[in-house]
Design a protein with these regions (language model features):
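Acidic/polar loop patches that form or flank catalytic/metal-binding clefts of enzymes
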Residues: 84, 102-103, 177-179, 192-193
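Flexible, low-complexity segments enriched for small/polar residues
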Residues: 142, 146-173, 181-241
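Generic structural signal for individual residues within well-ordered alpha-helical segments
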Residues: 41, 89, 164, 178-181
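Non-catalytic, conformational "gating/processing" segments within enzyme and secreted inhibitor domains
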Residues: 1-22, 26-159
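Short, mixed-charge aromatic SLiMs
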Residues: 29-33, 169-178
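Alpha-helix capping and helix-coil boundary motifs
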Residues: 36, 126-127, 175-176, 189, ...
Length: 241
């Protein structure tokens, strides 16, 4: 699950200052991997790696950078369609004021933050927490995350009835990830022959499995192998993972 979230809530060392910052994000994803999606999204939004990777650390309410706001909705939570350019602008304004200092610590500067509320997805928001709440409460959020997670675990998108049923499970739980994962893998279709054979292993999964089979404990060799296969951890090719 940590690998899934690393590819979904993407940051990359090619733009982030230090490996330490990337490792801290890894630990954050590990902490929240089967926890609450809302809490994880709140934490990632003000995480040093994400602030640097998608330019939140360069954003002020007077001159908001829209990169993170746009990807937050399009790639991380809602998908294309449920929001407008005005929503992107509003989210960027409300998210402004978070920075990373020279010691890689994150801090909030109220002088750079929004002076008052803005309208996002039909709600009044003025802080990062408000932005995440508005997004997570949107009816497109649960089905979007369900589809992405179902695809990762099974190799296929759910049909509409299955998606809506899983989205209801996810929403009723308050966006808890573990019950959603359990609902996906406990369904009889998960182990049916066509379904179970449709998902190819990612290079990282294949290499880890191979090392386990042969009893090899060599991180350097593992890194060389996944790099040769085109899937280096902490270096995704773009924000889509």
């Amino acid at each position: 699950m940590v690998w899934f979230w690393h590819g979904h809530l993407t940051s990359s060392h090619d733009k982030v200052d230090t490996w330490d910052i990337m490792w801290r994000q890894h630990l954050l994803l590990r902490e929240h991997a089967l926890g609450n999606f809302r809490a994880m999204l709140q934490a990632v939004t003000v995480d040093a790696a994400m602030l640097q990777y998608l330019d939140g650390a360069d954003s002020t309410a007077a001159q908001p950078n829209e990169n993170y706001a746009r990807e937050l909705m399009e790639l991380f939570s809602l998908g294309r369609g449920p929001y407008t350019q005005a929503d992107v602008r509003a989210a960027a304004t409300a998210l402004a004021g978070w920075y990373v200092d020279d010691d890689s610590a994150v801090y909030f500067d109220p002088e750079a933050a929004a002076p008052g509320p803005v309208t996002l997805l039909g709600r009044r928001v003025r802080s990062a927490a408000d932005v995440i709440d508005a997004i997570c409460d949107h009816p497109a959020c649960a089905p979007f995350i369900v589809t992405k997670l179902h695809r990762f675990l099974t190799g296929a998108d759910p049909d509409r009835a299955r998606r809506d049923g899983l989205a209801a499970v996810f929403a009723r739980s308050g966006l808890q990830i573990r019950p959603l994962v359990e609902a996906i893998v406990r369904d009889p279709s998960f182990t049916s022959a066509p379904q179970s054979q449709s998902r190819a292993r990612y290079p990282v999964e294949w290499v880890v499995a191979a090392l386990g089979v042969f009893g090899v404990d060599d991180a350097g060799r593992a890194l060389d192998a996944v790099t040769a296969l085109g899937q280096t951890p902490f270096l995704p090719p773009n924000v889509a993972g």
